[in-house]
């Protein structure tokens, strides 16, 4: 049963990653070339919110893996329609002098939003049933597509802007990798590996909690559904991760000024993350999982900051920095797909979810090894 769950989840995740990557290239190009009275971004943002909401509602009604994978892919399309034009609108509307402040605000919003999403989701499961989280997510998607358009100044018409042709070559240009850039590829591999290490536990968290941490829930005499302790644990971990991430955001700057080489800072952070992983691996309990979330959230916050610095330092050509950084960000998707595949294979071979922790440790340590091999 465990292997079937893991394989089904891996299929859904990989499909979502592939569809998302293709959708990002297509939507970005189409949004840039949209010529209507409402502007280039507004129609896509509204449509993205609607598509995401409708597909999420349909996803909650599906029970077979093929349908779930298909609908999850369509949710990703809607999400890309919502977020890619929104990010472009930020870049176009925010003056350079305010951009650092806005970027920080967006980062804080993402951290808080992720935690809120978890809390709302688990509350919906406990108090409303299994379909309620999908309805809540659909409502949030709909609001996300409408509220920004109402709050922002009205976007000017794009009808008078020059028309530019779109070609397959132009779409594929997004996936063109930098050439003769060994250090860049090391940074890319390091990021992919650490993303895989993080994804191995977060992706399978529900299964880890229900099949490993609370596997003796009913034999211990408890009568309430296992979803109650699982949801409580996941909510507690979300809070711990948020606290750790905020702590990392405050300390990253001063530490980076004291130790100038980001390679060492990234490696130390990777080691700290493996220590966090070792806690539930050696002492599986709700307490160790919360400690893992707290320490891991702090460590990954540092890894994320210093990894970006390493990537920027490894760019082969300043003239193509924007394109190369966009390509570097594909490492997050590669890591997510790797986590799904490694996790599914590991669970299928061992028949349990405890293998995910040592597998994650190997990935994170491999990332540290690649990082330290980079030339400064």
List where the protein language model places each region.
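Structural signature of the two symmetry-related core transmembrane helices
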Residues: 41-57, 264-278
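Intracellular juxtamembrane helix-capping segments at the cytosolic ends
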Residues: 81-94, 302-316
